[in-house]
């Protein structure tokens, strides 16, 4: 009888040990998966924010060049060619904006990113050089502020 009880206790101990080991392994695996998921999302956000900032800079640069092409005599380049290039860069900026909006959980950041794109789009829509210079500064500062805000969401 003692042998049967000892065997039963040994079997229960083995089962309990196996169950605890399984539970600890599952917790460790779950933590690893969660960490990996968070890190991948962080990397995707970093990439999206970087691509968007770069697209805004390129689009802004094209619009500044367009303003000079339209208002300088003689124009440094054909305004129509620069305008087409600006449209292409605007499309790239909009695509990058959509990616930022999909990846960020903060609605305010998404709205701020959209507002900066609208400001950049309007940078060349003036005939006044002082207003143009003010818009250039405002858009440069807006992009810098957006980058600093986005860093907090990584």
Segments from the language model and where they lie:
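Feature marks short, highly hydrophobic, charge-poor N-terminal signal-anchor/signal peptide-like helices
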Residues: 1-11
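Acidic, low-complexity proline/glycine-rich segments
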Residues: 10, 14-21
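Conserved non-transmembrane functional hotspots
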Residues: 19-154
């Amino acid at each position: 009888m003692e042998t049967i009880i000892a065997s039963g206790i040994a079997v229960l101990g083995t089962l309990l040990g196996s169950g605890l080991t399984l539970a600890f392994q599952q917790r460790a695996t779950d933590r690893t998966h969660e960490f990996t998921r968070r890190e991948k999302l962080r990397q995707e956000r970093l990439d999206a924010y970087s691509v968007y900032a770069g697209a805004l800079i390129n689009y802004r640069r094209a619009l500044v060049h367009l303003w000079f092409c339209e208002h300088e005599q003689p124009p440094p380049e054909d305004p129509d060619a620069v305008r087409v290039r600006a449209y292409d860069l605007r499309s790239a900026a909009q695509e990058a904006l959509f990616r930022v909006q999909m990846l960020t959980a903060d609605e305010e950041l998404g709205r701020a990113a959209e507002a900066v794109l609208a400001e950049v789009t309007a940078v060349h829509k003036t005939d006044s050089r002082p207003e143009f210079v003010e818009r250039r500064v405002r858009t440069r500062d807006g992009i810098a502020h957006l980058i600093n805000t986005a860093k907090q969401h990584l």
